[in-house]
A protein has these predicted regions:
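C-terminal helix-rich "cap/oligomerization" subdomain common to oxidoreductases
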Residues: 24, 206-251
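Predominantly a Rossmann-like dinucleotide-binding segment in NAD(P)-dependent oxidoreductases
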Residues: 36-127, 245
């Protein structure tokens, strides 16, 4: 079995080849995201789907990124790779857009968006001449919209998510703090969900659980191949949209 760091691949074409090989050899091909191990994200999913707390989903907003890979001091080898449009596929769009695509696909129980629209910019061309450092991706579903904000220009490092339903909102501020509010006339409630169980709270523990047969990933799990093929489809469409300036319909 194999676990790769997010995203699954540099392109949808590569992802399809990897998927074919994984299926041929009957192995799990898993993708690791830091946000998969956030108790707050799992609690948000639970409140939406198991407790039906906020009603039908209407909007998901995901913010990910920091103030730039060069600025935070990543090593030269990683920086060269991150800022190479061939090796990384794009800049902030792929580096941080993948998180929102992954979480949205999960919260939508594997449903693919109907359309993808993306706008990218390079705010710091002197640092990142070949790739974007700012990306906004909008996904549309029949009755839901997701906005993914991926950036190397945030003043702080962030990985947070907002989930809005017909009757309430849930905001996961980080890995341990979250809050929800069920209408104007209700108070905001703050939560600190307990840590996830062993095997579900860290990548190598999860991989070990899969290898030992203790965990059987469901198709829509955050690490699962099916979810991450949809992520790759979204990222590929986002790159096309940002190049053409047009919305891309998924087939």
């Amino acid at each position: 079995h194999v676990m790769v760091e997010k995203p699954l691949a540099v392109s949808l074409d590569h992802a399809k080849k990897m998927k074919a090989l994984a299926e041929k050899h009957n192995i799990h091909l898993l993708t690791n995201y830091e946000t998969t191990w956030y108790a707050t994200n799992h609690k948000a999913y639970d409140l939406v789907h198991n407790e039906s707390m906020v009603g039908e989903l209407r909007k998901i907003v995901v913010h990910d990124g920091h103030y730039g890979p060069k600025e935070i001091g990543v090593n030269d080898e990683f920086l060269d790779w991150l800022t190479d449009p061939v090796l990384n596929g794009a800049g902030a769009l792929t580096d941080f857009g993948c998180y929102g695509a992954n979480l949205t696909t999960w919260l939508m129980k594997g449903e693919r968006p109907q359309t993808v629209f993306a706008v990218t910019q390079t705010m710091k061309p002197e640092l990142y001449p070949k790739v974007d450092d700012e990306a906004t991706i909008i996904l549309t579903y029949p009755k839901m919209q997701a906005i993914i904000q991926a950036s190397w220009n945030w003043p702080i490092s962030r990985k947070d998510m907002e989930v809005y339903g017909k009757t309430g909102q849930i905001i996961a501020d980080n890995s341990s703090d979250m809050r929800y509010q069920l209408g104007d006339d209700k108070p905001e409630v703050k939560l600190k969900p307990k840590s996830l169980e062993a095997h579900y709270n860290a990548p190598f523990a999860y991989l070990a659980g899969v290898v030992k047969g203790k965990i059987k990933p469901a198709p829509n799990d955050l690490s699962a191949l099916e979810n991450n093929m949809t992520v790759m489809e979204i990222l590929e469409a986002a790159k096309k949209s940002s190049r053409t300036g047009k919305r891309v319909k998924l087939k």
